[in-house]
Amino acid sequence: AFSYGVLEALKRTEIENKAGQTLRLLDQIDIITGVSGGSFTALAYRLYGDKLFDEYEKRFLKRDVQGEITRRTLNPANWAALSSTGWGRSELAANLYDEILFDGATFGDLRRSDGPYVAVSATDITSGSRVIFTPQNFDFLCADRGSLRLSRAAAAPSAVPVVLSPVTIN
């Protein structure tokens, strides 16, 4: 909610440039970084632009997302998948995030829209080091960032150990 409030304040704040034109401060932002809950806001703003302000609260902020994840975890229909290797509660959460917020969008979809560059950070659980979801880092991993669903990118930095499983990037 904090990151969304910051974007709202930047949207409302007007500045005057040297030519005397009034501009929104939000339109002057070149990069947005996000970690944990802020990754949802950063990615959604990059995907939707100003439409975010019409839909984000209803679609995401004011929903009981934790409750929905818990209900899905307790649903016997999901138990086989949850007990398999390579698929865990974070994948279940990412599927929910797709349904309620990201609509299956990938990093590749972000290339087709205007807006600030978005850098989402997570933690590599094996080394404890920070991983920033940049093209360069994905090239190093020999992974295709363009096909990575935004929902999985948002799930990675919010994957609290024990509560949500780590997100694996192949």
PLM segments and residue spans:
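Short, structural beta-strand-to-alpha-helix junction motif
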Residues: 24, 100-111, 149
